């Protein structure tokens, strides 16, 4: 997401949880420093006084990627104990797009009800599912497609997205 936003010339604000850092080290070759270097602004999770914690700070919206079930549940219940959940809460109250790229599977009924509640509040649940019609040749192409589809929800058109061209 950060690479795409940089390509598009869009300012990005990054908040990373401890769990996200563990996921980063397990699933990518990026170091935390390399990740944070991709963002325009980096905020600490505990900094609930950051700019993005206020509705008066203008943003296009927010993407939580990846979004854990824990974070999703906190957002759904209005728990704002970290900057991540506070910024998401502000995004909802200001009626800006909030895209949650929930990646846990399978879902149980509680997860689905939480997703329903969030959708009713205005959030968009967008699991990072591969678009096989795009015939991805690598994991990176699958990731880029999911990122691009999420950016579409903000009216941002990223060139890495392969668009559906109909059956051939």
Features from the language model and the residues they span:
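A cross-family phosphate/adenosyl-ligand binding-site feature
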Residues: 1-99, 103-168
């Amino acid at each position: 997401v950060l690479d795409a936003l940089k390509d598009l010339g869009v300012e990005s604000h990054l908040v990373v949880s401890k769990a996200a850092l563990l996921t980063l080290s397990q699933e990518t070759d990026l170091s935390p420093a390399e990740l944070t270097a991709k963002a325009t602004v980096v905020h600490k999770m505990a900094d609930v006084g950051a700019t993005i914690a206020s509705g008066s700070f203008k943003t296009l919206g927010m993407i939580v990627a990846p979004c854990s079930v824990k974070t999703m549940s906190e957002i759904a219940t209005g728990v704002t104990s970290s900057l991540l959940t506070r910024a998401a809460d502000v995004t909802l109250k200001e009626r800006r797009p909030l895209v949650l790229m929930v990646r846990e599977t399978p879902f149980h009924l509680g997860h689905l009800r939480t997703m329903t509640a969030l959708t009713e509040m205005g959030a968009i649940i967008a699991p990072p599912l591969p678009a096989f019609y795009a015939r991805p040749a690598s994991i990176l192409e699958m990731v880029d497609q999911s990122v691009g589809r999420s950016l579409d929800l903000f009216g941002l058109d990223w060139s890495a997205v392969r668009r559906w061209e109909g059956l051939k």
